[in-house]
């Protein structure tokens, strides 16, 4: 029987006979004495095997990396000068008396401590990859976060209730994963994009406080913070307003950071969506970066410079400046690199002014190809509004507001992370905030219709109900997002609890009464049976843990993730199925799967 984990054997076991089990992490032969570092989920312990125990020595000699071993021996102090203070077991070693090889191992595709691996190699050999201490640490932290959520919500009176994984397809922004029904030919289930409607119905049913940690599915293009299946911490409450819901979830987040990381988070400030877009070009601003936009659209309406004037006169145009302290030292190559970077977001160029002498608002004091095209008053306004000092650089964005916000917003983050620490406009701290007062709708220019910013079940702010019909663009929602270091880790809203208001929202979205009844009849019908005011919030567990681990991708905090092409390299999923299975489901393929390489 195992005495304890390898990584937990310490001086309290001195002189005792212990049994440890794990993997041979490293084997060394030093002058006739064999050393094996035995590894399990808690870490390593050093085992010494000398020739005085011939049977154990023989088995140790035949062992190789990743062999699974059971070792019994006596715990003793390491010789002077060989202790490792970074390990719990670093002051002791085990003098082996018995060794049992529980299983041999083929040579692994890479060394467990190899850090220079491509992601494809790691994901193809995910089981071996998961043996690496970094991955063990990440998944242990994920477990602690999930337990922290459960413990906190349990204390707050929330009930864990499961909702269906097979449900009907309803539009929620992304494509559904569809599951054909064998029993009902020609009909399909959908895997849930979220438990949204079911959790609202649980509030109508009177459960008052619900939560679950559940899988959700979205068939969308993937990025570093996206997976086709992801884990959501889903929360819903009755009879609470947005302030009360934000207080509960903020308290939960603070408690988790304190318990798991030993970090005390500050009170979460609140920022309107309008301010977030105005100053940072993003609804999830990274507040570690102190750089802000300076609005210049009004100034440029009076200028002759076509690039700026054209954007300023555009219906949805915007002109902003981004002042970077000490940025005048940026090289031509750096500026060219930034120009290429903003082009990713649709920017056609990146104008700039290097400020050499603020007392000379001309080409002598301001270094830039665009200075000669701007009036003295325009230059004066730029310097005054940005607060530029000698040695600064000012970058400009001029285009449709969407392009400017995305391009200059991304540039703000990039420069902040690359140069902010040494120049005082970046802090290595946790900077959470709430973003509130989101628009209820956004206009889809391609389809020329209004769409829901969050989802169509979000309640409008009191007094904004009539705007849904008269001026949807000015209608604000009772929605709120929790943002941490530039990542949206949670989003929620107060829901619509009256059927007549829900029907008005559907009407604003051009969903006909027939379509409303077909897709959402079960919701509308039940809202009429005395639905309480209710609201909630959903956290992305994967994103939250990624931030807490300092990982580069959510794939580093998920045991068996998909690639950016929505494939599992370990199991080669998705895969083609045989014709018999298709016939049973009454399906015929229009396009056959390509043969595997």
Swiss-Prot record:
Site (Important for tRNA non-discrimination): 30, 81
Gene Ontology CC: cytoplasm
Domain of life: Bacteria
Residues annotated for ATP binding in this entry: 218-220, 227, 488, 540-543
Catalytic activity from the UniProt record: tRNA(Asx) + L-aspartate + ATP = L-aspartyl-tRNA(Asx) + AMP + diphosphate
Keywords: Aminoacyl-tRNA synthetase, ATP-binding, Cytoplasm, Ligase, Nucleotide-binding, Protein biosynthesis
GO molecular function: aspartate-tRNA ligase activity; aspartate-tRNA(Asn) ligase activity; ATP binding; nucleic acid binding
InterPro entries named among the record's database cross-references: Aa-tRNA-synt_II, aa-tRNA-synth_II, aa-tRNA-synth_II/BPL/LPL, Asp-tRNA-ligase_1, Asp-tRNA-ligase_1_N, Asp/Asn-tRNA-synth_IIb, AspRS_core, GAD-like_sf
Pfam families: GAD, tRNA-synt_2, tRNA_anti-codon
Enzyme class label: ligase
CDD domains linked: AspRS_core (cd00777), EcAspRS_like_N (cd04317)
Annotated compartments: Cytoplasm
Binding site for L-aspartate: 172, 218, 454, 495
GO biological process entries: aspartyl-tRNA aminoacylation
UniProt region (Aspartate), positions on chain: 196-199
EC number, UniProt record: 6.1.1.23
Subunit structure: Homodimer.
Family: Belongs to the class-II aminoacyl-tRNA synthetase family. Type 1 subfamily.
Role of this protein: Aspartyl-tRNA synthetase with relaxed tRNA specificity since it is able to aspartylate not only its cognate tRNA(Asp) but also tRNA(Asn). Reaction proceeds in two steps: L-aspartate is first activated by ATP to form Asp-AMP and then transferred to the acceptor end of tRNA(Asp/Asn).
Protein name: Aspartate--tRNA(Asp/Asn) ligase
Organism, as annotated: Chromobacterium violaceum (strain ATCC 12472 / DSM 30191 / JCM 1249 / CCUG 213 / NBRC 12614 / NCIMB 9131 / NCTC 9757 / MK)
Taxon lineage: Bacteria, Pseudomonadati, Pseudomonadota, Betaproteobacteria, Neisseriales
Gene: aspS
């Amino acid at each position: 029987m195992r005495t304890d984990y390898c990584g937990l054997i310490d001086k309290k076991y001195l002189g005792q006979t212990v049994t440890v089990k794990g993997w041979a992490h490293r084997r060394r032969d030093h002058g006739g004495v064999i050393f094996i570092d035995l590894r399990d989920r808690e870490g390593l312990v050093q085992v010494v095997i000398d020739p005085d125990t011939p049977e154990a020595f023989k088995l140790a000699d035949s062992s190789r990396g990743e062999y699974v071993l059971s070792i019994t021996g006596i715990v003793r102090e390491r010789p002077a000068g060989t202790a490792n203070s970074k390990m719990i077991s670093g002051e002791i070693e085990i003098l082996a008396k018995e060794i049992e090889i529980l299983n041999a191992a083929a040579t692994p595709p890479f060394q467990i401590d190899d850090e220079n691996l491509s992601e494809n190699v790691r994901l193809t050999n995910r089981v071996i990859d998961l043996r690496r201490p970094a991955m063990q640490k990440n998944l242990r932290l994920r477990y602690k976060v999930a337990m922290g959520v459960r413990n906190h919500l349990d204390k707050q009176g929330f009930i864990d209730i499961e909702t269906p994984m097979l449900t009907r397809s309803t539009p929620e922004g992304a494509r559904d994963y569809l599951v054909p029904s064998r029993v009902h030919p020609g009909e399909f289930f959908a895997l849930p994009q979220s438990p949204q409607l079911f959790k609202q119905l649980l509030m109508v049913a009177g459960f008052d406080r619900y939560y679950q940690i559940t899988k959700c599915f979205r068939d969308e293009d993937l990025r570093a913070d996206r997976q086709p299946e992801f884990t959501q911490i889903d929360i819903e409450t009755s009879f609470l307003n947005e302030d009360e819901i934000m207080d509960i979830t903020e308290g939960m987040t603070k408690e988790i950071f304190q318990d798991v990381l030993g970090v005390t988070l500050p009170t979460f400030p609140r920022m309107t969506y309008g301010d977030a877009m105005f100053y940072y070009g993003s609804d999830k601003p990274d507040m570690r970066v102190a750089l802000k936009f300076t609005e210049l659209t009004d100034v440029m309406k009076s200028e002759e410079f076509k690039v700026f004037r054209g954007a300023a006169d555009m219906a949805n145009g915007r002109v902003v400046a981004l002042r970077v302290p000490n940025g005048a030292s940026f090289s031509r190559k750096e500026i060219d690199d930034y120009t290429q970077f903003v082009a990713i977001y649709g920017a056609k160029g990146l104008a700039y002014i290097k400020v050499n002498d603020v007392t000379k608002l001309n080409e002598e004091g301001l270094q830039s190809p665009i200075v000669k095209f701007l009036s003295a008053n325009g230059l004066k306004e730029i310097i005054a509004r940005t607060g530029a000092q000698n040695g600064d650089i000012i970058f400009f964005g001029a285009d449709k507001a969407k392009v400017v916000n995305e391009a200059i917003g991304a540039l703000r983050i990039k420069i902040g992370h690359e140069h902010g620490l040494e120049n005082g406009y970046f802090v290595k701290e946790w900077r959470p905030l709430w973003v509130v007062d989101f628009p209820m709708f956004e206009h889809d220019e391609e389809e020329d219709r209004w769409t829901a910013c969050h989802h169509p079940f979000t309640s409008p702010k009191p007094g904004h109900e009539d705007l849904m019909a008269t001026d949807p663009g000015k209608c604000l929602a009772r929605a709120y997002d929790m943002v941490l270091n530039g990542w949206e880790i949670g989003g929620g809203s107060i829901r619509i609890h009256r059927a007549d208001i829900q029907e008005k929202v559907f009407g604003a979205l051009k969903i006909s009464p027939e379509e409303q009844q077909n897709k959402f009849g079960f919701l509308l019908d039940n809202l009429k049976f005395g639905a309480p005011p209710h609201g909630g919030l959903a956290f992305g567990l994967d994103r939250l843990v990624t931030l807490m681990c300092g990982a580069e991708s959510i794939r580093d905090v998920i045991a068996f993730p998909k690639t950016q092409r929505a494939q599992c390299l370990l199991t080669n999923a998705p895969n083609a199925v045989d014709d018999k299975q298709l016939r049973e489901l009454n399906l015929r393929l229009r396009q056959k799967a390509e043969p595997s390489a």
